[in-house]
UniProtKB/Swiss-Prot annotation:
GO biological process entries: translation
Domain of life from the UniProt record: Bacteria
3-methylthioaspartic acid carried by residues: D102
HAMAP family: Ribosomal_uS12_B (MF_00403_B)
Cystines in this chain: none
Gene3D superfamilies to which the protein is assigned, alphabetical: Nucleic acid-binding proteins (2.40.50.140)
UniProt keyword annotations, A-Z: Methylation, Ribonucleoprotein, Ribosomal protein, RNA-binding, rRNA-binding, tRNA-binding
PANTHER family: 30S RIBOSOMAL PROTEIN S12 FAMILY MEMBER
Protein name in the entry: Small ribosomal subunit protein uS12
Assembly mode: Part of the 30S ribosomal subunit. Contacts proteins S8 and S17. May interact with IF1 in the 30S initiation complex.
Lineage: Bacteria, Bacillati, Bacillota, Bacilli, Bacillales
Signal peptide: none
InterPro entries, sorted: NA-bd_OB-fold, Ribosomal_uS12, Ribosomal_uS12_bac
Length: 139
């Protein structure tokens, strides 16, 4: 326990929390060609690679991912949620934060139903998370 005199000389320092999605906390000034401190909830990007990867130890699957170059020139790996997708190289996608626990280095999700990404076909529950329109009522 420090003395009051020690605290007067050097006060306690508050902990600095590190961002879990750092690519969303940078903007880009194309005139100066420099990064700026503009935070945003989502960012647009172009797919440079689309593929599958295997998850960490207890799980087994082929998880779909895309390598995306964002508008701030940062390249990130993003997860493609849902069953089936229409993404390929040069597709324009919207990225949000949120990591995938069993994929190493994947800190972002692609938003389904936005820009070039289609919603999940035949989905009836949790439709808003997968960009699926409400099905037509049968008479």
């Amino acid at each position: 326990m420090p003395t009051i005199n020690q605290l007067v000389r050097k006060p306690r320092q508050s902990k600095i929390t590190k961002s879990k999605s750092p690519a969303l906390n940078k903007g880009y000034n194309s005139f100066k060609k420099s990064l700026t401190d503009v935070k945003s909830p989502q960012k647009r990007g172009v797919c440079t690679r689309v593929g599958t990867m295997t998850p960490r130890k207890p799980n087994s699957a082929l998880r779909k991912y895309a390598r995306v170059r964002l508008t701030n020139q940062i390249e990130v790996t993003a997860y493609i949620p849902g069953e089936g997708h229409n993404l390929q190289e040069h597709s324009v996608v919207l990225i949000r934060g949120g990591r995938v626990k069993d994929l190493a280095g994947v800190r972002y999700h692609i938003v389904r139903g936005a820009l070039d990404t289609a919603g999940v076909n035949g989905r009836l529950q949790s439709r808003s998370k997968y960009g699926t329109k409400r099905p037509k009522e049968k008479k």
